[in-house]
Regions:
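Conserved N-terminal catalytic/coupling substructures associated with nucleotide/phosphate chemistry
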Residues: 1-119
């Protein structure tokens, strides 16, 4: 079933990412922390924001595996989330839905420091 991109305007509950930044995961993991610490939200991978353009992902299952791995290692405690492959304009993308959590604050943990983000 196609994903309704028109329903998701980038704002406080939605963030678009052209691709998974593995060398700079902080760029999207801080959004995971912020969504978990507030009202939840979606990170949609495979969509450029400015101008909005669906570019898709070459290997969405690998992206899903890496997202799951990095969230478990870098967000403390691990938030509630759902990650799934979605079709947008005929291209494979990934929707990471982060739910607000009962155990906040949720921290981005890296190199001995813990930082909580909010939106």
């Amino acid at each position: 079933m196609p994903f309704p991109l028109d329903h998701y305007i980038e704002a406080s509950h939605v963030d678009y990412k052209e691709r998974l930044e593995e060398k700079k995961p902080r760029s999207w993991l801080k959004s995971v922390s912020a969504f978990a610490n507030t009202e939840g939200g979606h990170l949609i991978f495979g969509v450029k924001n400015e101008p909005r353009e669906v570019v898709g992902l070459e290997n969405p299952q690998a992206v899903i595996s890496r997202l799951t791995e990095l969230i478990k290692v870098r967000i403390d405690p691990t938030p509630r989330y759902r990650v799934r492959e979605v079709e947008i304009e005929g291209k494979s993308c990934v929707d990471l839905e982060v739910q607000d959590g009962p155990a906040y604050p949720y921290y981005y943990a890296f190199d001995g420091s813990h930082t909580a983000y909010v939106r």
